[in-house]
Amino acid sequence: SRHLRELVSLTGFPITSTLQGLGAYPGDDPQFLGMLGMHGTYEANNAMHDCDLMINIGARFDDRITGKVDEFSPGSKKIHVDIDPSSIGKNIKVDLAIVSDVTELLKSLNKRFKEKNKNFVSSNKQKTSKWWEQIGKWREKKSLNFINSNKVIKPQHAVQRLYELTKNQDTFITTEVGQHQMWAAQHYKFNKPNRWMTSGGLGTM
């Protein structure tokens, strides 16, 4: 998680996450676009669709993320990093496959970026400024907004309040599968790794 945060800071790139990856990058950081996929944010899904370079670190391109595989991010070059070679190219064809331990790869990438000239970070952020402007427009849609009520407890509001009351504690969140799982994933900002325990593709209850 620390090396991932450093990479995002060095590059100025936006970052999103799958359901199982929540917490690997701080959920309250401005460069985090929220969760990706069927139950993800408008900005995360549009950024993934329109990007020119996609770096997939340890995710498997499942159907909840890709939708129609032939329409998934059609204009991007795709780099897929995974320690398991059988996971690469299984669902989505990629342009560069890297079989590696993620921590070691991130260390190497960060080292190379740091070896660039001192103006690299600021110049790279300038190059992505228009991209961030577009992301800002998508964010204005506020895709996870809901109409609160003073008559009933809205689940989204309950999760948000839980976050506010526990964000300064070392909190672990667990769910089974279903709609409440999606509300938790959408409205609780996981800021540390391994604090989110939930069933993914197997859908166990």
Feature annotation, model-predicted:
Residues 1, 62-67, 182, 205:
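Short glycine/serine/threonine-rich phosphate/pyrophosphate-binding segments
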Residues 1-18, 53, 170-171:
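Catalytic alpha/large subunits of respiratory electron-transfer oxidoreductases
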Residues 2-6, 11, 43, 94, ...:
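Conserved catalytic alpha/beta core of Sir2/sirtuin-type deacylases, generalized to analogous enzyme cores
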Residues 4, 134-205:
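Active-site diphosphate/adenylate-binding microenvironment
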Residues 16-18, 56-57, 100, 173-177, ...:
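General beta-strand structural signal in soluble alpha/beta enzymes
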Residues 21-130:
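Glycine-rich, acidic loop regions that bind phosphate or pyrophosphate groups
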